[in-house]
From Swiss-Prot:
<keyword id="KW-0694">RNA-binding</keyword>
<dbReference type="InterPro" id="IPR023798">
    <property type="entry name" value="Ribosomal_uS7_dom"/>
</dbReference>
<dbReference type="InterPro" id="IPR005717">
    <property type="entry name" value="Ribosomal_uS7_bac/org-type"/>
</dbReference>
<comment type="subunit">
    <text>Part of the 30S ribosomal subunit. Contacts proteins S9 and S11.</text>
</comment>
<dbReference type="InterPro" id="IPR036823">
    <property type="entry name" value="Ribosomal_uS7_dom_sf"/>
</dbReference>
<keyword id="KW-0820">tRNA-binding</keyword>
<dbReference type="Pfam" id="PF00177">
    <property type="entry name" value="Ribosomal_S7"/>
</dbReference>
<protein>
    <recommendedName>
        <fullName>Small ribosomal subunit protein uS7</fullName>
    </recommendedName>
</protein>
<dbReference type="InterPro" id="IPR000235">
    <property type="entry name" value="Ribosomal_uS7"/>
</dbReference>
<keyword id="KW-0689">Ribosomal protein</keyword>
<keyword id="KW-0699">rRNA-binding</keyword>
<dbReference type="GO" id="GO:0000049">
    <property type="term" value="F:tRNA binding"/>
</dbReference>
<dbReference type="GO" id="GO:0019843">
    <property type="term" value="F:rRNA binding"/>
</dbReference>
<dbReference type="InterPro" id="IPR020606">
    <property type="entry name" value="Ribosomal_uS7_CS"/>
</dbReference>
<dbReference type="GO" id="GO:0006412">
    <property type="term" value="P:translation"/>
</dbReference>
<keyword id="KW-0687">Ribonucleoprotein</keyword>
<dbReference type="GO" id="GO:0015935">
    <property type="term" value="C:small ribosomal subunit"/>
</dbReference>
């Protein structure tokens, strides 16, 4: 085991507009090439579109969308005696959030709307209604874990 102290997770500053750490993380996931101001514009525009269409608070819809995309179990590859098994494991809360945000952004990028803000808004609305590509990704991961339940005793 290493003798050095374990490095803790960095504190993230909440975003300036809504004062939310979750939103600040989401902005960082959207950001490309260090262009944070562009990422902020995309997120805020998407949240405005969502609030306009849903008639609910911005962050409530975002939280609902992320709740419907968060995975509870995933599979990890484990090599046992020459063969590799897909072992189902529970997902830590921090990783759940990270995966949900990543899947939501990936699904939004694959959509067909004109701007990224509209794509993200559409995917958030779909995810909050429990449909869409990001939710399908979560269902696939859960299905994979369910199919490999027999190897759960290899967990570490």
């Amino acid at each position: 085991m290493p003798r050095r102290r374990v490095v803790g997770q960095r504190k993230i500053l909440p975003d300036p507009k809504f004062n939310s750490e979750l939103l600040a993380k989401f902005i960082n996931v959207i950001m490309q090439d260090g262009k944070k101001s562009v990422a902020e514009k995309i997120i805020y525009k998407a949240l405005d579109v969502v609030a306009e269409k849903k008639g609910e608070d911005h962050l409530v819809v975002l939280e609902a969308a992320l709740d419907n995309v968060r995975p509870s179990v995933e599979v990890k590859s484990r090599r046992v005696g020459g063969s590799t098994y897909q072992v189902p494991c529970e997902v830590r809360p921090v990783r759940r959030n990270a995966l949900a945000m990543r899947w939501l952004v990936e699904a939004a990028r694959k959509r067909g709307e004109k701007s990224m803000a509209l794509r993200l808004a559409g995917e958030m609305l779909d995810a909050s209604d429990n449909k869409g590509t990001a939710v399908k990704k979560r269902e696939d991961v859960h299905r994979m874990a369910e199919a490999n339940k027999a190897f759960a005793h290899y967990r570490w």
